């Protein structure tokens, strides 16, 4: 991404609205522009605080984030991104919906440093109670309910990871993963079926993360 220059107009900030809060609002709610363009953050009235809007000639739809979802301060949400109730985006994670929609289902977690991005015609769809591990990359793929993508794994365009499946850490997934199976390697291959208790534990793991996110957000899950 090209170097971006930001101008922050804060002269009309209302009392009690911090610069950090402004930055968070800019990440969550505003259109973005092409990397080559100069971006100006312009204040606008929202919820008692002046909100920074990233303006430019090519804005994308604003994110839609449920009131009970949690986004860490250092995470980035751009464009056509939808986050359902109880979902969470952890520190330095990126959901960039500038080319295609990204949807994150209820109770799903996108952990530290993970990246979600799509290509035209290849959106990212994350189901319910899904875990995406630290530094994983999900690009133009579908993760069905209850699956888990391990640390540093990569899931590429057009792939569907079936419900309850487990992608081992560091794997590169280039083809569909059957539901309830363990895949590993680069390229990833099916190693075995998962027992029902392992699939259930993945679902519970996602629920634990949802509760942890709620504690970070200081809300009741």
Residue locations for each model-derived region?
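N-terminal, intrinsically disordered charge-dense segments
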Residues: 27-46
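Glycine-rich hexapeptide-repeat left-handed beta-helix
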Residues: 47, 51-65, 92, 98-106, ...
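Residue-level detector of intrinsically disordered terminal segments
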Residues: 9, 29, 51-53
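Short, positively charged low-complexity motifs
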Residues: 5-7, 18-19, 29
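N-terminal segments that cap or nucleate solenoid repeat domains
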Residues: 52-89
